A protein has these predicted regions:
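Short loop/turn segments that flank or connect secondary-structure elements
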Residues: 1-76, 80-188
């Protein structure tokens, strides 16, 4: 199980990827298959729709949590770029009372810099975290390759649900949202 060995880590991730559909309850897989249709029937503003999508994502990823090292206290992904949109900024502001910076900073290379919401090795806005944080789940047995110094040095299968992605993109389009890094909106 020594996942410092790249081949071992990739094999473990591939095995876990093969198990994903077996650990997710059928009703969730069926709902994911009809998610775009579900989105078409939703009423409300983009923020309301995003919150509903977050609820679904949380259900699906809860089922997959047995296959991933992603747990509270692992902060590797909190040190890579975190893309957010205006509608996600609104979710964070309304959910936490934290206000965005008055002046949005210029884009920068945020790789290796901690997320402004990382406090005591935990996400302080976990319930209101952005989409990218919800869906960024690795399938290796350990978080060794998640370290920002190793991230992007090797390829691993990542969890991805096509209908979830389509609905998220539709919400962004509806909100006319432009992406930025979370550190631009909320960093010092």
């Amino acid at each position: 199980m020594d996942e410092q060995n790249l081949v071992t880590a990739q094999e473990n991730a591939s095995l876990a990827a093969d198990k994903v559909k077996r650990v997710i309850p059928n009703y969730l897989l069926e709902k994911e298959g009809r998610l775009v249709e579900w989105y078409g029937r939703l009423k409300g503003n983009p923020r309301t729709k995003l919150l509903m999508l977050y609820g679904f994502i949380d259900e699906i990823y809860k089922a997959v949590s047995v296959l991933t090292p992603c747990k509270k206290g692992c902060t590797s992904c909190c040190h890579i770029p975190v893309s957010i949109s205006e509608v996600e900024i609104e979710v964070i502001e309304r959910g936490t009372g934290t206000r965005r910076n008055k002046n949005i900073s210029h884009p920068s290379n945020y790789h290796g810099r901690p997320c402004p919401f990382l406090l005591n090795n935990a996400c302080s806005i976990y319930t209101h975290r952005p989409f990218v944080c919800r869906r960024h789940v690795v399938l290796t047995k350990t978080s060794h390759w998640c370290n920002p110094n190793l991230a992007n040095t090797a390829k691993f299968p990542l969890l991805k649900f096509s209908e979830v992605e389509r609905v998220f993109q539709a919400i962004l389009w509806e909100a006319k949202a432009k992406p930025m890094d979370i550190r631009q909106a909320f960093g010092n």
